[in-house]
Structures are given as structure tokens and as C-alpha cells.
Amino acid sequence: MSRYLGPRFKIIRRLKTLPGLTSKRPKYKKRVRRSSRPWWKKSRHLACLQEKQKIRFHFGLTERQLRQYVQITKKVQGSTGQVLLQLLEMRLDNILYRLGLAGTIPGARQLVNHRHILVNDHVVNIPSYQCKPQDVITIKGKKTDQLKTIITRNRNKARENKIPYHLTLDLSQNKGIVNKIIDRKDIQLNIKEMLVIEYYSRRI
């Protein structure tokens, strides 16, 4: 399954807030609830599917990519759900988004694909690149002025969202630093990751 490129509001109306997908918020219309099916409850499978879709669309993954990440978690010690989120949080495109260098993860992915980003002074054009503690992320020199304007705009839009403690942003030097791997308690996503693991448990 390819990466979703359709209307983003359609997704967040169904799955609720996904800040990595879009910074905009749709206007919800009030609907009168019908009581024709008061017995209806969300099935376990549907709950797992929705959590899986939240992760997919928030981080901008294809179905194949997410499946591969779940497979990796089974080879690593620790809680599989926590490891899954940590792997996704340490992707280069997500780090750029969390630093405020891009307004959304798709926007961060575009910066990486266009070779604007350096990791430890080397150009990296792979959005899924796994960042490590002590990695230094900078913006390529010849585009600095243009991108600083974009960065400032994105930071102003997200003033209420503080940069996570595992990252440091130095706008004076136009760089970000990965201090450490993020802890689960500091991942502020409304996602039940163990339901995602459960979803794939019978499919891998």
C-alpha cells in the first residue's frame, strides 16, 4: 500500500487530531445521535485497526513500512509498543518536525528529499534515517536564509508545543541536537501502541 496523498481533513475527522499529518483543524458539524443501535460497541479488531491507522497517518508511513517496524520491535529487548514508538520518533523527518524546522512531517520529508538537511555534516536524503544520540542536524548553507524564514514561521505557529527534552534547537547556529532517545512518557501522542502490536500479531 502506497503512502496516503489524499485529503488530510478526511483522515483527521475519522481518527481525530494527528499533528504530524497537518497543523490545520477541520470544523466539525454537530450531528444528532441516533439511538437506533444503542447496543453497538466498537469491536476489538476495529479498535486495533484505528490505532494502527493513527500511527500510519501521523508518521506518514506506508503499510509495508509500518509492518517492517513492527517486525524490528520483535527482535529488540523491551516493550514492543514502546520500542515501536521510539523507532518512529527517531526518524529524521519526525526529528525535524519535533524541532520545529517543519510544520508537519510531510513538510519535513520534503526538506530531506530535496537534500536541504545535513546530519553530522553529511547530506542525508532519506526521511526514514534513524537518528542517534549526539547527532547534529543542520540546514544546508545556501538555503539557510530562505529556510530560516520557514523555521521562524513554523516555530511561531507552534509556540504552545515545547521542544521535547531529548532534543535541543539552536536557531542562532541553525542546528538541532539529539540528546538521547525519547522515553515513552514524553511521547505526547494519543495512541495505544499495544493495540497496533496486537493488530499485527496474527499477520506477521
UniProtKB/Swiss-Prot annotation:
Gene3D superfamilies: Ribosomal Protein S4 Delta 41, Chain A, domain 1, RNA-binding S4 domain. Residues 90-150 form the S4 RNA-binding domain. It comes from the Eukaryota. Keywords: Chloroplast, Plastid, Ribonucleoprotein, Ribosomal protein, RNA-binding, rRNA-binding. It is found in: Plastid, Chloroplast. One of its GO terms (molecular function) is structural constituent of ribosome. GO terms for cellular component: chloroplast; small ribosomal subunit. Pfam families: Ribosomal_S4 (PF00163), S4 (PF01479). GO terms for biological process: ribosomal small subunit biogenesis; translation. HAMAP family: Ribosomal_uS4_B (MF_01306_B). Part of the 30S ribosomal subunit. Contacts protein S5. The interaction surface between S4 and S5 is involved in control of translational fidelity. Belongs to the universal ribosomal protein uS4 family. One of the primary rRNA binding proteins, it binds directly to 16S rRNA where it nucleates assembly of the body of the 30S subunit. With S5 and S12 plays an important role in translational accuracy. This is Small ribosomal subunit protein uS4c. It comes from Gnetum parvifolium (Small-leaved jointfir). The lineage of its organism: Eukaryota, Viridiplantae, Streptophyta, Embryophyta, Tracheophyta.
